């Protein structure tokens, strides 16, 4: 009887040890996940629909590696945060790379007929904010699954302003709205050799490009460039949106988007809303 009791006690102790070991490994794994420093992402460019821009070059620094990814797309104008193209994907052998840490971009604002450059190393606070966004999964109710942000969007605005977004399936979030580039001189021949050959001057080149954006030119003639426009756009309010349906039995399903003037959007991440 004593022998049986000893065996039971030893077996019980081994079970506790194994369980604790497994819990420790799980906790360690989850902690490491929360400290991920390599992510799968791509760098993108965008601008407001009414203010089309053209990129000369754009590079995004990768973590503390000293490396960068270069944006291949030149033309923008689909909307705030609406990326028009993709990049030379720069993942390492493990399928990921460090989070964005800097931006060096030169672009042409057609309506202003000016070149701007933003060359900035992100603050540690901004780098950490971007890393946290890449680490955090968000739930997509219609798809019933989690997604991660996989896009880093450089959005150019008039007068050299730049907003930065993280972008994913069904969601886009503004992470920085305080960056401002400086006006620079770029010879048209260096920017676009064919454009220089046929247009000769920057004014003529921009006027030619704007033929593809007639609505933007019309808007510019009516409204010009408002100094306070983007400050108004980025102001956020703590709205609680309520829907009232004519049909009291109507139900608003989860498969719809919230879209904001900032260019942010996301799927409703909750259960269906009854009227």
State what each model feature region is.
Residues 1-5:
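Positively charged n-region of N-terminal signal peptides that target proteins for export
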Residues 16-19:
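C-terminal motif of bacterial Sec signal peptides marking the signal peptidase cleavage site
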Residues 21-23:
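Bacterial signal peptide processing site
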Residues 58-109, 253-275:
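Tryptophan-paired
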Residues 108-117:
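Short acidic/polar inter-strand loop motif in beta-rich domains
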Residues 119-127:
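Short beta-strand edge segments in extracellular beta-sheet folds
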Residues 130-232:
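Compositionally biased low-complexity segments at domain edges in trafficked proteins
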Residues 200, 204-275:
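Long, low-hydrophobicity ectodomains and other hydrophilic envelope-associated domains
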């Amino acid at each position: 009887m004593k022998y049986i009791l000893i065996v039971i006690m030893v077996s019980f102790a081994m079970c506790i040890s194994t369980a604790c070991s497994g819990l420790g490994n799980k906790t360690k794994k989850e902690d490491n996940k929360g400290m991920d420093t390599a992510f799968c992402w791509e760098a993108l460019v965008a601008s407001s629909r009414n203010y089309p821009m053209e990129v000369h070059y754009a590079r995004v620094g990768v973590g503390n590696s000293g490396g960068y990814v270069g944006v291949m797309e030149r033309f923008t104008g689909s909307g705030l945060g609406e990326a028009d193209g993709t990049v030379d994907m720069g993942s390492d052998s493990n399928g990921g790379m460090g989070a964005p840490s800097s931006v060096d971009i030169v672009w042409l604002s057609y309506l202003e007929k000016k070149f701007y450059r933003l060359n900035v190393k992100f603050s540690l606070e901004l780098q950490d904010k971007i890393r946290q966004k890449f680490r955090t999964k968000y739930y997509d109710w219609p798809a019933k699954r989690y997604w991660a942000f996989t896009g880093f969007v450089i959005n150019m605005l008039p007068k050299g302003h730049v907003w930065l977004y993280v972008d994913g399936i069904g969601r886009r979030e503004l992470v920085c709205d305080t960056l401002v580039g400086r006006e620079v001189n770029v010879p048209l021949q260096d920017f676009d050799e064919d454009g220089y050959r046929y247009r000769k001057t920057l004014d003529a080149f921009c006027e030619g490009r704007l033929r593809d954006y007639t609505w933007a030119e019309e808007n510019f003639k009516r409204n010009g460039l408002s100094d306070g426009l983007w400050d108004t756009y980025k102001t956020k309010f703590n709205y609680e949106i309520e829907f009232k349906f004519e049909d009291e039995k109507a139900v608003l399903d989860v498969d719809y988007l919230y879209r904001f003037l900032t260019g942010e959007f996301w799927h409703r991440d909750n259960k269906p809303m009854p009227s």
